């Protein structure tokens, strides 16, 4: 049997780079769940005092082409382009992903729609920032 080398996984490896392809982000999420977890950061206005705004993304889903808006292509990767009942729709490098569940720092895991009811992100004006 031939051995291969794999680097040690660090917590920082889970940072979501929204300019990557949707399929790559979804695979990253599956690979790094439950540890180290895939994460992004909320816009500054949603951060609580003494909180980094780190949000662990625990579930994403692909949208059918019929459910997408061609105008979303003009937005930068990481931009929340729409808010659906199931959660925020975030622009990626080659399309969009629906964030179906996430866990804010110091909080329990929530469905994407429940998260939006507590922190109403505005489409096309708020971004999920990389670190």
Feature names for model-found ranges:
Residues 13, 18-131:
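An anion-binding loop in the catalytic cleft
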């Amino acid at each position: 049997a031939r051995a291969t080398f794999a680097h040690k996984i660090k917590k920082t490896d889970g940072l979501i780079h929204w300019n990557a392809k949707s399929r790559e982000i979804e695979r990253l999420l599956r690979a790094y769940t439950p540890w180290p977890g895939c994460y992004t950061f909320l816009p500054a206005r949603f951060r609580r005092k003494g909180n980094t705004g780190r949000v662990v993304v625990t579930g994403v889903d692909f949208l059918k082409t019929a459910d997408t808006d061609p105008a979303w292509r003009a937005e930068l990767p990481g931009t929340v382009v729409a808010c659906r009942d199931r959660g925020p729709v975030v622009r990626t490098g080659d399309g969009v992903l629906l964030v179906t569940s996430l866990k804010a720092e110091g909080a329990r895991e929530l469905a994407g729609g429940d998260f939006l009811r507590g922190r109403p992100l505005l489409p096309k004006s708020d971004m999920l920032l990389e670190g």
